[in-house]
UniProtKB/Swiss-Prot annotation:
It is found in: Nucleus. The N-terminus is blocked. Its main location: nucleus. Keywords: DNA replication, Nucleus. This is Replication factor A protein 3. One of its GO terms (biological process) is DNA replication. InterPro entries: Rfa2, Rfp3_Saccharomycetes. One of its GO terms (cellular component) is DNA replication factor A complex. Component of the heterotrimeric canonical replication protein A complex (RPA). Belongs to the replication factor A protein 3 family. GO terms for molecular function: double-stranded DNA binding; sequence-specific DNA binding. It comes from Saccharomyces cerevisiae (strain ATCC 204508 / S288c) (Baker's yeast).
Length: 122
């Protein structure tokens, strides 16, 4: 299952061979009910040891749902079939944290890298 829906780095979305993939990202805005703007962590192209946030635009949503702005989700996505930029979100799971807990950006990047190297990791 994990190899069929790989967890990907946001910089590699346009090169994903799988029709369905997963990405961990933070909601920045929801301009319309069917559109999102996300930010997802990756390794900086300028400095290979720092984490930077990549903004992802032109994202369509297949479900009628209002997302929590600034919250983290894991998304199950499908690449556009028509050659346009962006992708379609098929499902989303909110990453809930206990009080005073937050997401580790370095941890997300490490998970993305491990999943690329070992696709059987779910």
């Amino acid at each position: 299952m994990a190899s069929e829906t790989p967890r990907v780095d946001p910089t590699e979305i346009s090169n994903v061979n799988a029709p369905v993939f997963r990405i961990i990202a933070q909601i920045k805005s929801q301009p319309t009910e069917s559109q999102l703007i996300l930010q997802s962590p990756t390794i900086s192209s300028k400095n290979g040891s720092e984490v930077e946030m990549i903004t992802l635009n032109n994202i369509r949503v297949s479900m009628n749902k209002t997302f929590e702005i600034d919250s983290w989700y894991e998304f199950v996505c499908r690449n556009n079939d028509d050659g346009e930029l962006g992708f379609l979100i098929l499902d989303a799971v909110l990453c809930k944290f206990k009080e005073n807990e937050d997401l580790s950006l370095n941890g997300v990047v490490a998970l993305q890298r491990l999943c690329k190297k070992y696709p059987e990791i779910y």
